Amino acid sequence: ALIAAGVARVVAAMKDPNPLVAGQGLTQLAAAGIAVTSGLLEAEARALNVGFVSRMTRGRPWLRLKVAMSLDGKTALNNGVSQWITGPDARTDAHAWRARSCAVLTGFGTVRDDDPRLTVRDIDTPRQPRPVVVDSRLETPLTAKLLVGGALIFAARHDAEKINALTTRGAEVVVLPNSAGKVDLAAMLLELGCRGFNEILVEAGARLNASLLREGLVDELLIYQAPVLLGDKARGMADLPELVELSAAQRLTITDRRMVGVDQRILALLN
């Protein structure tokens, strides 16, 4: 269409990372005598399309782990109560991140304890993100609210009767065990990439958060930090092992920090 329109110059922010078509369009334009420039604001373009770039170059979605925490780094009281640590503005902002995601990933423990829908609320959106559950032992209740949203459940054991019951209620079950009898998280991300998922928002508990972090599968942290202190007995964001050397600490790069209502929002890339 551009060639037929007779344009004299085309400026592209970046080449298409899809290996099937990468650069071919720009090559065709140049062959037709059109002046072509690419790379203008490329970093910004990649940031806008971070999920698609991830899927094209790594075969898996961009994984963004969202956490709402206190100033002392706690995500819930020791009894599990966490509603609400952050204020209404932060919660609305979090729904905007859900809206831009292809799926919201959680674990069985969150489904059991909170029975979330993982849907976008109070924001207009053309589609809802798909709920994805890591449930190694296939224990998701048949009454779970997210089944109505066509949940995709990853399990480590095959139970034909339970799978059939979950499928009847609208879910899809994929069995992907690792050698330890748990869900193979890396294989799960590759499967999600094959299904066309670009960005995944993780809203899970400390155990799944820790597993994803330990395996190096988290690309970015989305942290909402509220001006409140919950004390040393409250729960943390991830059940990670104790470090004895600072050199072993996971380093992050903060890319954005701003106030959302009374809470602070931090975006950080994992190095």
Where are these regions (language model features)?
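Residues at the N-termini of beta-strands
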Residues: 9-10, 103, 199, 220
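Flexible, gly/pro- and Lys/Arg-enriched active-site loops
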Residues: 214-252
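Active-site ligand-binding patch in enzyme domains
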Residues: 51-198, 207-210
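Active-site-proximal loop->helix
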Residues: 18-32, 145-146, 163-170, 236
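Zn2+-dependent cytidine deaminase-like catalytic core
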Residues: 1-44, 130, 213
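Conserved histidine-centered catalytic loops in small-molecule metabolism enzymes
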Residues: 240-271
